[in-house]
């Protein structure tokens, strides 16, 4: 159902119910939904059941009165064809054929804008995702964050929000020191497992690559950063640290580029210390009497803000616990004007939510409860050749995002540099094809198949099929299809396809409200299914000119919606497969 149709039906129900509640304080909510069973009509409303009990009436009788009010008005006949009462008092409406067909004209006229709205009214939203430590290549978990975060950002942009995609670099922790000593050890000729190899060091082959470039005094640069030139002195641990961090930031940039993800801003954790923001945050909490000292440590009274226990802010050795810079960072987000902040992170961050929110509330600077929002995802298991893959040579202890993209792209041909679009499309679609809070098994073998079991192929093939049909239509102009008579579109498969097209705008809004971009992937799979069923049941280029033109318009509109949805989740829409 189109937005304009939904608004009109809402107003019609409001007018119909007004006389029934005029002498009461009732203010019923008009909720319109699509019935799960298409045979029940196009629109379902539970209004009668809302008001029947306070009116002391039978809900089915109330539903009959409301339905009669809708049908008796001649002005409604262009929109409503029939109304039925189902179950305890649901009102099921069947829209006119012209109303169902109107979506084709709307899609063709709006094109790439179909599904978008100004709901956000330019409200500033910051979505932080990936935010990997610069200590190694991106892994598949970062890939899931990238797919989720980028699609979520596009959802908010499509609904009129002013979105900033941000990558937060944790470049100030103990892991950075471990990275530096790992590179130093490699530079001295040590290898994992031999005497003198540092405990907890990083073992991947990439550490040797960094050491080689450091000894060669190479220069590297990364996003939003100055170039760094290695000193070449293997005893210069600070130069090793700076070079290694920048080297890996550059590598992560290349991974993200291959994945088709671009960030608007990169924020360094180290800048929070350099600018004094961490100290200022701690001082503000102390002055507000939200802290206390115990056993030589500084504690925050997080139990005052729904946490299950108070948390240490500064340990007895004088170092801060990891949630303190997080509080400072989110204070900065708020001060930058982001009234909504969303963090896409792994489920292992669950324990930080309460303490970060508690710290922000304790500052008492106007930040609302529940800020920021969190979308936590569960782990990804990678299967290849029927077996689980747990490590890669590149990283040493985990499967990298780059591995997954390359594996899903297919085999190397004659050693040539490949276009990684196929692999990127598969990984991005697969990684948002489940709810974030469910574990996901990524089967590379399925990603490489060209059949219905491969969801991205299934959707892209629907788009390519339409392109093939329209390429055979050589005696017309697509620009004029929005003027075609659509009344011949009466076949059952056409009705189902029309209904699915009309669901797209509401799908986007629901996905945004629930922070669930997986719903877009679900929708695209369903739309592709309707298209394939229609394609197998009906011919498009028939001899009947009026029917042919109506079906061509329907195909063009379906292609546009497939293209819009795929673009939103960062997947290509090929014309040929």
From Swiss-Prot:
Enzyme category, top tier: ligase
Location (main, coarse): cytoplasm
Domain of life: Bacteria
Span of the annotated motif 'HIGH' region: 132-142
Gene Ontology MF terms in the entry: arginine-tRNA ligase activity; ATP binding
UniProt xrefs under InterPro entries: aa-tRNA-synth_I_CS, Arg-tRNA-ligase, Arg-tRNA-synth_N, Arg-tRNA-synth_N_sf, ArgRS_core, DALR_anticod-bd, Rossmann-like_a/b/a_fold, tRNAsynth_Ia_anticodon-bd
Pfam family of the protein (one): tRNA-synt_1d
Reaction(s) this enzyme catalyzes, per UniProt: tRNA(Arg) + L-arginine + ATP = L-arginyl-tRNA(Arg) + AMP + diphosphate
GO cellular component, one term: cytoplasm
GO BP of this protein: arginyl-tRNA aminoacylation
Keywords attached to this entry: Aminoacyl-tRNA synthetase, ATP-binding, Cytoplasm, Ligase, Nucleotide-binding, Protein biosynthesis
Transmembrane stretches, start-end: none
Compartment(s): Cytoplasm
E.C. code: 6.1.1.19
HAMAP family per the UniProt record, alphabetical: Arg_tRNA_synth
Family the UniProt entry places it in: Belongs to the class-I aminoacyl-tRNA synthetase family.
Quaternary structure (record): Monomer.
Protein name as annotated: Arginine--tRNA ligase
Organism: Janthinobacterium sp. (strain Marseille) (Minibacterium massiliensis)
């Amino acid at each position: 159902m189109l937005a304009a149709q939904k608004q009109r039906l809402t107003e019609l129900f409001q007018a119909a119910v007004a006389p029934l509640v005029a002498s009461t304080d009732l203010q019923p909510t008009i909720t319109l939904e699509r019935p799960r069973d298409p045979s029940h009509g196009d629109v379902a409303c539970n209004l009668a059941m809302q008001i029947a009990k306070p009116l002391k009436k039978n809900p089915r009788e109330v539903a009959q009165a409301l339905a009669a009010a809708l049908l008796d008005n001649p002005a409604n006949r262009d929109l409503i064809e029939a109304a039925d009462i189902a179950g305890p008092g649901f009102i099921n409406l069947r829209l006119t054929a012209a109303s169902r067909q109107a979506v084709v004209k709307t899609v063709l006229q709006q094109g790439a804008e179909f599904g978008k709205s100004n709901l956000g009214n330019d409200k500033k939203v910051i979505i932080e995702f990936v935010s990997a430590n610069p200590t190694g290549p991106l892994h598949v978990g970062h890939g899931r964050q990238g797919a989720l975060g980028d699609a979520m950002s596009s959802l908010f942009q499509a609904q009129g929000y002013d979105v900033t995609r941000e990558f937060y670099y944790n470049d100030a922790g103990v892991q950075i020191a471990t990275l530096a000593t790992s590179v130093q050890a490699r530079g001295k000729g040590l290898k994992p497992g031999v005497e003198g190899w540092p405990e907890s060091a990083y073992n991947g082959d990439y550490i040797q690559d960094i050491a080689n470039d450091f000894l060669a005094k190479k220069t590297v640069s990364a996003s939003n950063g100055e170039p760094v030139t290695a000193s070449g002195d293997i005893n210069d641990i600070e130069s090793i640290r700076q070079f290694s961090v920048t080297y890996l930031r550059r590598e992560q940039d290349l991974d993200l580029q291959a994945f088709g993800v671009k960030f608007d801003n990169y924020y360094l954790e180290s800048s929070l210390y350099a600018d004094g923001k961490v100290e200022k945050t701690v001082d503000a909490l102390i002055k507000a009497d939200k802290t206390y000292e115990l056993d030589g440590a500084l504690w925050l009274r997080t139990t005052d803000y729904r946490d299950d226990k108070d948390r240490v802010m500064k340990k007895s050795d004088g170092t801060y616990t990891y949630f303190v810079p997080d509080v400072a960072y989110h204070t900065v987000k708020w001060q930058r004007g982001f009234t909504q902040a969303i963090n896409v992170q792994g489920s292992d961050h669950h324990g930080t939510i309460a303490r970060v929110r508690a710290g922000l509330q304790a500052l008492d600077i106007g930040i609302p409860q529940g800020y920021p929002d969190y979308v936590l995802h569960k782990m990804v298991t990678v299967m290849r050749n029927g077996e689980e893959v747990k490590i890669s040579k590149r990283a040493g202890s985990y499967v990298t995002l780059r591995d997954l993209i390359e594996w899903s792209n297919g085999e190397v041909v004659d050693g040539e540099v490949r276009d990684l679009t196929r692999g990127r499309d598969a990984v991005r679609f697969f990684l948002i094809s489940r709810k974030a809070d469910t574990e996901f098994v990524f089967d590379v073998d399925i990603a490489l198949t060209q059949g219905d079991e491969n969801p991205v192929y299934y959707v892209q093939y629907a788009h390519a099929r339409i392109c093939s049909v329209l390429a055979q239509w050589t005696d017309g102009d697509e620009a004029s299809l929005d003027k075609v008579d659509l009344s011949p579109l009466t076949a059952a498969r056409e009705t189902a396809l029309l209904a699915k097209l009309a669901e797209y705008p509401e799908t986007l809004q629901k996905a945004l409200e629930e922070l669930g971009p997986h719903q877009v992937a679900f929708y695209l799979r369903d739309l592709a299914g309707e298209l394939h069923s229609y394609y197998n049941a009906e011919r498009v280029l028939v001899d009947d000119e009026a029917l042919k033109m109506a079906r061509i318009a329907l195909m063009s509109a379906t292609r546009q919606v497939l293209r819009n949805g795929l673009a939103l989740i960062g997947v290509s829409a090929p014309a040929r497969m």
